[in-house]
Design a protein with these regions (language model features):
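Glycine/acidic-rich beta-strand-loop module
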Residues: 47-76
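Ser/Thr-glycine-rich phosphate-binding loops at phosphate-binding pockets of nucleotides
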Residues: 31, 147-155
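Histidine-centered acyl-transfer/condensation active-site motif
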Residues: 139-146
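Residue-level signal for inorganic ion chemistry
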Residues: 64, 85, 156, 233, ...
Length: 288
Protein backbone atom coordinates (compact mmCIF):
# COMPACT_ATOMS: atom_id res chain seq x y z
CA UNK A 1 0.00 0.00 0.00
CA UNK A 2 1.36 3.39 -1.01
CA UNK A 3 1.18 6.04 1.73
CA UNK A 4 -0.10 9.11 -0.12
CA UNK A 5 0.26 11.34 2.94
CA UNK A 6 3.91 10.37 3.31
CA UNK A 7 4.54 11.12 -0.38
CA UNK A 8 2.80 14.49 -0.04
CA UNK A 9 4.91 15.48 2.97
CA UNK A 10 8.09 15.07 0.91
CA UNK A 11 6.87 17.18 -2.01
CA UNK A 12 7.42 20.90 -2.47
CA UNK A 13 4.47 23.07 -3.47
CA UNK A 14 6.05 23.29 -6.93
CA UNK A 15 6.02 19.48 -7.22
CA UNK A 16 2.40 19.29 -6.06
CA UNK A 17 1.31 21.89 -8.60
CA UNK A 18 3.26 20.08 -11.32
CA UNK A 19 1.67 16.67 -10.64
CA UNK A 20 -1.43 17.11 -8.53
CA UNK A 21 -5.23 17.08 -8.53
CA UNK A 22 -7.74 19.43 -6.89
CA UNK A 23 -11.23 18.17 -6.05
CA UNK A 24 -13.40 21.12 -7.13
CA UNK A 25 -17.05 21.57 -6.19
CA UNK A 26 -18.39 22.87 -9.50
CA UNK A 27 -21.04 25.60 -9.24
CA UNK A 28 -24.09 25.87 -11.48
CA UNK A 29 -23.47 28.05 -14.55
CA UNK A 30 -19.99 27.61 -16.01
CA UNK A 31 -18.99 24.73 -18.26
CA UNK A 32 -16.56 22.13 -16.96
CA UNK A 33 -13.92 23.55 -19.31
CA UNK A 34 -14.46 27.05 -17.91
CA UNK A 35 -13.99 25.75 -14.36
CA UNK A 36 -10.82 23.93 -15.37
CA UNK A 37 -9.48 27.02 -17.15
CA UNK A 38 -10.30 29.21 -14.14
CA UNK A 39 -8.17 26.92 -11.94
CA UNK A 40 -5.35 27.10 -14.49
CA UNK A 41 -5.36 30.88 -14.57
CA UNK A 42 -5.54 31.62 -10.85
CA UNK A 43 -2.81 29.08 -10.04
CA UNK A 44 -0.62 30.21 -12.94
CA UNK A 45 -0.38 26.73 -14.49
CA UNK A 46 0.49 25.67 -18.04
CA UNK A 47 -2.56 23.43 -18.36
CA UNK A 48 -5.39 21.76 -16.50
CA UNK A 49 -8.02 19.16 -17.40
CA UNK A 50 -11.10 17.73 -15.72
CA UNK A 51 -12.08 14.12 -15.00
CA UNK A 52 -15.51 13.95 -16.66
CA UNK A 53 -17.79 16.66 -18.03
CA UNK A 54 -20.68 18.07 -16.03
CA UNK A 55 -23.37 20.07 -17.85
CA UNK A 56 -23.33 23.81 -17.01
CA UNK A 57 -26.31 23.61 -14.63
CA UNK A 58 -25.02 20.48 -12.86
CA UNK A 59 -23.03 20.98 -9.64
CA UNK A 60 -20.66 18.86 -7.61
CA UNK A 61 -17.46 16.86 -7.75
CA UNK A 62 -15.20 17.86 -10.65
CA UNK A 63 -11.59 16.73 -10.10
CA UNK A 64 -9.13 19.02 -11.90
CA UNK A 65 -5.72 17.69 -12.95
CA UNK A 66 -2.77 20.09 -12.78
CA UNK A 67 0.02 20.30 -15.37
CA UNK A 68 1.56 16.83 -15.89
CA UNK A 69 -1.28 15.15 -14.02
CA UNK A 70 -3.44 15.96 -17.08
CA UNK A 71 -1.91 12.84 -18.61
CA UNK A 72 -3.83 10.81 -16.01
CA UNK A 73 -7.25 12.06 -17.16
CA UNK A 74 -8.00 9.08 -19.38
CA UNK A 75 -7.23 6.65 -16.56
CA UNK A 76 -9.89 8.21 -14.31
CA UNK A 77 -12.71 8.89 -16.81
CA UNK A 78 -14.23 5.41 -16.76
CA UNK A 79 -14.61 5.28 -12.98
CA UNK A 80 -18.09 4.99 -11.43
CA UNK A 81 -20.00 8.17 -10.66
CA UNK A 82 -22.66 8.88 -8.03
CA UNK A 83 -25.36 11.54 -8.23
CA UNK A 84 -28.28 12.94 -6.29
CA UNK A 85 -30.95 14.86 -8.16
CA UNK A 86 -34.56 15.87 -8.55
CA UNK A 87 -36.73 14.58 -11.38
CA UNK A 88 -40.16 15.85 -12.30
CA UNK A 89 -42.80 13.39 -13.49
CA UNK A 90 -45.25 14.91 -15.95
CA UNK A 91 -48.11 13.07 -14.25
CA UNK A 92 -48.39 11.50 -10.81
CA UNK A 93 -47.72 7.78 -10.42
CA UNK A 94 -47.67 5.67 -7.28
CA UNK A 95 -44.35 5.21 -5.51
CA UNK A 96 -44.75 1.45 -5.89
CA UNK A 97 -45.08 1.77 -9.68
CA UNK A 98 -42.14 4.17 -9.86
CA UNK A 99 -39.91 1.85 -7.82
CA UNK A 100 -40.94 -1.10 -9.97
CA UNK A 101 -39.99 0.64 -13.21
CA UNK A 102 -36.78 2.03 -11.70
CA UNK A 103 -35.68 -1.56 -11.13
CA UNK A 104 -35.85 -2.05 -14.91
CA UNK A 105 -33.18 0.66 -15.18
CA UNK A 106 -30.84 -1.01 -12.70
CA UNK A 107 -28.07 -3.29 -13.95
CA UNK A 108 -26.98 -3.38 -17.60
CA UNK A 109 -28.96 -0.93 -19.75
CA UNK A 110 -28.79 0.33 -23.33
CA UNK A 111 -28.45 4.08 -23.75
CA UNK A 112 -28.41 6.36 -26.78
CA UNK A 113 -26.44 9.56 -26.05
CA UNK A 114 -28.48 12.79 -26.11
CA UNK A 115 -28.70 14.72 -29.38
CA UNK A 116 -26.51 17.54 -28.01
CA UNK A 117 -23.77 15.25 -26.66
CA UNK A 118 -20.24 15.43 -28.06
CA UNK A 119 -19.93 11.69 -28.65
CA UNK A 120 -21.19 9.71 -31.63
CA UNK A 121 -24.88 8.87 -31.28
CA UNK A 122 -24.85 5.11 -31.20
CA UNK A 123 -26.42 2.86 -28.61
CA UNK A 124 -24.06 1.89 -25.81
CA UNK A 125 -24.30 -0.49 -22.88
CA UNK A 126 -23.88 1.05 -19.44
CA UNK A 127 -24.36 -0.25 -15.92
CA UNK A 128 -26.58 1.40 -13.33
CA UNK A 129 -25.45 -0.02 -9.99
CA UNK A 130 -28.01 1.71 -7.80
CA UNK A 131 -31.07 3.82 -8.61
CA UNK A 132 -33.29 4.71 -5.66
CA UNK A 133 -35.87 7.16 -4.38
CA UNK A 134 -34.79 9.28 -1.42
CA UNK A 135 -37.91 11.41 -1.06
CA UNK A 136 -41.09 12.32 -2.92
CA UNK A 137 -43.13 15.51 -3.09
CA UNK A 138 -46.02 15.08 -5.49
CA UNK A 139 -44.55 14.77 -8.97
CA UNK A 140 -41.06 15.77 -7.84
CA UNK A 141 -38.75 12.91 -6.87
CA UNK A 142 -35.43 13.19 -5.04
CA UNK A 143 -33.26 10.29 -6.21
CA UNK A 144 -29.77 8.86 -5.98
CA UNK A 145 -28.00 7.03 -8.82
CA UNK A 146 -24.68 5.19 -8.83
CA UNK A 147 -23.61 4.52 -12.40
CA UNK A 148 -20.79 3.46 -14.67
CA UNK A 149 -18.73 6.32 -16.09
CA UNK A 150 -20.23 7.64 -19.32
CA UNK A 151 -23.87 7.16 -18.24
CA UNK A 152 -26.14 10.11 -19.05
CA UNK A 153 -28.40 10.83 -16.06
CA UNK A 154 -30.63 13.26 -17.94
CA UNK A 155 -31.24 10.56 -20.56
CA UNK A 156 -31.82 7.98 -17.82
CA UNK A 157 -34.59 10.14 -16.38
CA UNK A 158 -36.09 10.77 -19.84
CA UNK A 159 -36.14 7.05 -20.63
CA UNK A 160 -37.65 6.28 -17.22
CA UNK A 161 -40.49 8.72 -17.95
CA UNK A 162 -41.08 7.06 -21.33
CA UNK A 163 -41.26 3.61 -19.71
CA UNK A 164 -43.67 4.93 -17.08
CA UNK A 165 -45.84 6.31 -19.88
CA UNK A 166 -46.11 9.76 -18.29
CA UNK A 167 -42.87 11.48 -19.27
CA UNK A 168 -40.20 12.90 -16.95
CA UNK A 169 -37.37 15.39 -16.96
CA UNK A 170 -34.53 16.31 -14.65
CA UNK A 171 -34.84 19.47 -12.56
CA UNK A 172 -31.57 19.43 -10.63
CA UNK A 173 -28.47 17.24 -10.49
CA UNK A 174 -25.41 17.09 -8.28
CA UNK A 175 -22.46 14.73 -8.57
CA UNK A 176 -21.37 13.57 -5.13
CA UNK A 177 -18.67 11.12 -6.24
CA UNK A 178 -16.40 10.61 -9.24
CA UNK A 179 -14.46 7.40 -8.66
CA UNK A 180 -12.32 7.86 -5.54
CA UNK A 181 -13.12 11.60 -5.37
CA UNK A 182 -16.05 12.46 -3.07
CA UNK A 183 -17.67 15.68 -1.94
CA UNK A 184 -17.33 14.69 1.72
CA UNK A 185 -13.96 12.92 1.66
CA UNK A 186 -12.32 13.27 5.08
CA UNK A 187 -8.90 14.31 3.74
CA UNK A 188 -9.77 15.83 0.37
CA UNK A 189 -13.36 17.14 0.35
CA UNK A 190 -14.43 19.09 -2.71
CA UNK A 191 -13.80 22.83 -2.44
CA UNK A 192 -15.52 25.72 -4.15
CA UNK A 193 -13.83 28.09 -6.57
CA UNK A 194 -14.35 30.82 -3.99
CA UNK A 195 -12.45 28.78 -1.37
CA UNK A 196 -9.68 28.11 -3.89
CA UNK A 197 -9.34 31.83 -4.57
CA UNK A 198 -9.00 32.48 -0.83
CA UNK A 199 -6.14 29.98 -0.34
CA UNK A 200 -4.28 30.40 -3.64
CA UNK A 201 -1.60 32.66 -2.11
CA UNK A 202 -1.38 30.76 1.19
CA UNK A 203 1.09 27.93 0.52
CA UNK A 204 0.20 26.05 3.71
CA UNK A 205 -3.51 26.03 2.90
CA UNK A 206 -2.91 25.33 -0.80
CA UNK A 207 -0.83 22.26 0.11
CA UNK A 208 -3.80 20.91 2.07
CA UNK A 209 -6.14 20.83 -0.90
CA UNK A 210 -3.80 19.43 -3.57
CA UNK A 211 -3.97 15.66 -3.97
CA UNK A 212 -0.72 14.07 -5.24
CA UNK A 213 -1.09 12.43 -8.65
CA UNK A 214 0.18 9.24 -7.00
CA UNK A 215 -3.43 8.77 -5.88
CA UNK A 216 -3.73 6.77 -9.13
CA UNK A 217 -2.38 3.91 -7.00
CA UNK A 218 -5.87 3.67 -5.46
CA UNK A 219 -7.27 2.93 -8.93
CA UNK A 220 -4.69 0.52 -10.33
CA UNK A 221 -2.79 -2.05 -8.23
CA UNK A 222 0.76 -1.22 -7.23
CA UNK A 223 3.78 -3.04 -8.65
CA UNK A 224 7.23 -2.39 -7.20
CA UNK A 225 10.33 -2.50 -9.40
CA UNK A 226 13.98 -2.76 -8.42
CA UNK A 227 15.62 0.59 -7.76
CA UNK A 228 18.46 -0.12 -10.18
CA UNK A 229 16.03 -0.56 -13.10
CA UNK A 230 14.05 2.64 -12.43
CA UNK A 231 16.15 5.00 -14.57
CA UNK A 232 15.97 2.73 -17.61
CA UNK A 233 12.21 2.30 -17.25
CA UNK A 234 11.77 6.06 -16.84
CA UNK A 235 13.19 6.40 -20.35
CA UNK A 236 10.11 4.58 -21.64
CA UNK A 237 11.46 1.05 -21.82
CA UNK A 238 9.26 -1.91 -20.84
CA UNK A 239 9.36 -3.72 -17.52
CA UNK A 240 10.93 -7.16 -17.65
CA UNK A 241 10.16 -9.82 -15.08
CA UNK A 242 13.72 -9.52 -13.75
CA UNK A 243 12.98 -5.85 -12.89
CA UNK A 244 10.19 -6.76 -10.46
CA UNK A 245 10.85 -6.45 -6.73
CA UNK A 246 8.60 -9.47 -6.13
CA UNK A 247 6.39 -11.94 -8.00
CA UNK A 248 3.06 -10.65 -9.32
CA UNK A 249 0.14 -12.36 -10.99
CA UNK A 250 -2.07 -10.14 -13.16
CA UNK A 251 -4.20 -10.73 -16.22
CA UNK A 252 -2.91 -9.52 -19.58
CA UNK A 253 -4.14 -5.97 -20.43
CA UNK A 254 -4.56 -5.04 -16.76
CA UNK A 255 -3.17 -1.61 -15.90
CA UNK A 256 -0.82 -1.17 -12.96
CA UNK A 257 0.69 1.71 -10.96
CA UNK A 258 4.45 1.25 -10.98
CA UNK A 259 6.64 2.47 -8.11
CA UNK A 260 10.23 2.16 -6.96
CA UNK A 261 9.74 2.33 -3.18
CA UNK A 262 7.57 5.48 -2.86
CA UNK A 263 8.73 7.02 -6.16
CA UNK A 264 6.01 6.93 -8.80
CA UNK A 265 7.26 5.67 -12.17
CA UNK A 266 4.04 5.58 -14.19
CA UNK A 267 1.04 3.59 -15.39
CA UNK A 268 1.85 0.42 -17.33
CA UNK A 269 -0.15 -2.27 -19.13
CA UNK A 270 0.48 -5.97 -18.50
CA UNK A 271 1.46 -7.93 -21.62
CA UNK A 272 3.48 -10.95 -20.33
CA UNK A 273 5.26 -11.64 -23.62
CA UNK A 274 8.79 -13.14 -23.85
CA UNK A 275 9.86 -12.02 -20.39
CA UNK A 276 8.35 -8.55 -20.95
CA UNK A 277 6.00 -8.01 -18.02
CA UNK A 278 4.46 -4.63 -18.92
CA UNK A 279 4.71 -1.71 -21.33
CA UNK A 280 4.32 2.00 -20.48
CA UNK A 281 1.06 3.90 -20.91
CA UNK A 282 2.32 6.95 -19.00
CA UNK A 283 5.73 7.67 -17.47
CA UNK A 284 6.36 10.52 -15.03
CA UNK A 285 9.72 12.12 -15.72
CA UNK A 286 11.54 13.64 -12.72
CA UNK A 287 10.28 17.09 -11.76
CA UNK A 288 13.15 19.56 -11.63
Amino acid sequence: MIDIDKIKEKKTIKELLEFGIINIDKPSGPTSFEVSDFVRKILGLRKTSHFGTLDPKVTGVLPIALNRACKLTGFFLGEDKEYVGIMSLHEKVSQEELERIMKDFTGKIKQLPPVRSRVKRQEREREVKNFEILETDGKEILFRAEVQGGTYIRKLIHDLGEKLGVGAHMLELRRIRAGIFKEDNEKYPSISLYELEKVMKDEKMLRKIIIPGEIISQIYPVVQINEESAERILRGQPIYEKNLAEKYNFNVENKISVFSEDRFIGVFRIINEREVFAKPEFVLQPIS
